[in-house]
């Protein structure tokens, strides 16, 4: 196929594309059959035009739009609530008789939070609170009560209400997990016996 009068353009693969396109027009599915329009369609179609843009993803369900109509970073208060929720849930799941490593992990978790917490002034305050009130993680009850006490120390400094720590298990009790699957120690069974 001779080059077009206007030249090959700037794409170095353009001659190859034109040659392959011309060759594919001449291929027949069944060479001994009479040519018809369907059989003369190219088996291969190459184009130098950009690929079509993929369809845009479907919009989120309406309940997602209603729930969070603002697309903004979390506030300091929202991060605080989420952090306390996580910590109280961890304390509620903490073993009644933790291993030395689990007690160490509880202390280290609090130390890490005091270093990495996304609110600098909150992290500094939490370091002070931890220094004055070292982590108590000898059992689930002790860890939960200590965390409730520390949470109340923070709440007092913010002028927020104090939570009655005798109700901590009613508020943050163990997760409802079948066959103790929420236990930190878990079980050695890969598949539970039925």
Swiss-Prot record:
Q: What class of enzyme is it?
A: oxidoreductase
Species annotation: Oryza sativa subsp. japonica
The record's subunit annotation is:
Homodimer.
Its PTM note reads: Contains three disulfide bonds; one catalytic disulfide (Cys-119 to Cys-122), one structural disulfide (Cys-148 to Cys-165), and one shuttle disulfide (Cys-177 to Cys-182).
Give the span(s) annotated as Disordered.
Answer: 44-72
Q: What does this protein do?
A: FAD-dependent sulfhydryl oxidase that catalyzes disulfide bond formation. Oxidizes thioredoxin in vitro. Required for the import and folding of small cysteine-containing proteins in the mitochondrial intermembrane space, and can act independently of the oxidoreductase MIA40. Can oxidize the cytochrome c oxidase assembly protein COX19, a typical substrate of MIA40.
Enzyme Commission no: 1.8.3.2
Catalyses: 2 R'C(R)SH + O2 = R'C(R)S-S(R)CR' + H2O2
Q: Where in the sequence does UniProt note compositional bias of the Pro residues kind? A: 49-63
Protein name (Swiss-Prot/TrEMBL): FAD-linked sulfhydryl oxidase ERV1
Q: Where does FAD bind?
A: 76, 81, 84, 121, 125, 148, 151-152, 155, 160, 171
The cellular location(s) given in this protein's UniProt record come to: Mitochondrion
Which gene specifies this protein's sequence?
ERV1
Q: Which residues form the ERV/ALR sulfhydryl oxidase domain?
A: 72-172
Example GO molecular function:
flavin-dependent sulfhydryl oxidase activity
- Annotated GO CC locations: mitochondrion
Major location category of this protein: mitochondrion
Keyword terms, alphabetized: Disulfide bond, FAD, Flavoprotein, Mitochondrion, Oxidoreductase
Q: Which cofactor does it need?
A: FAD
Pfam families hit by this protein: Evr1_Alr
Per the annotation, the residue ranges of the short sequence motif Required for dimerization and substrate specificity are 177-182
Q: What PANTHER family does this protein map onto? A: ALR/ERV, FAD-LINKED SULFHYDRYL OXIDASE ALR
Disulfide partners: 119-122, 148-165, 177-182
């Amino acid at each position: 196929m001779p080059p077009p009068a206007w030249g090959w353009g700037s794409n170095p693969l353009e001659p190859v594309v034109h040659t392959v396109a011309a060759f594919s027009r001449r291929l027949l599915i069944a060479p001994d059959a009479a040519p018809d329009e369907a059989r003369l369609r190219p088996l291969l179609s190459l184009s130098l035009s950009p690929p079509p843009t993929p369809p845009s993803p479907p919009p989120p369900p309406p309940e997602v739009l209603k729930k969070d109509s603002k697309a903004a970073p979390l506030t300091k208060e929202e991060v605080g609530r989420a952090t306390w929720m996580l910590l109280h849930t961890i304390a509620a799941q903490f073993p009644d008789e933790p291993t030395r490593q689990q007690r160490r992990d509880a202390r280290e978790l609090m130390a890490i939070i005091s270093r990495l917490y996304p609110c600098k002034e909150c992290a500094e305050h939490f370091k002070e609170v931890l220094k004055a009130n070292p982590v108590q993680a000898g059992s689930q009850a002790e860890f939960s009560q200590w965390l409730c006490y520390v949470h109340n120390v923070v709440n007092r400094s913010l002028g927020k209400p104090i939570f009655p720590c005798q109700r901590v298990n009613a508020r943050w009790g163990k997760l409802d997990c079948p066959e103790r699957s929420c236990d930190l120690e878990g079980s050695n069974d890969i598949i539970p016996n039925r």
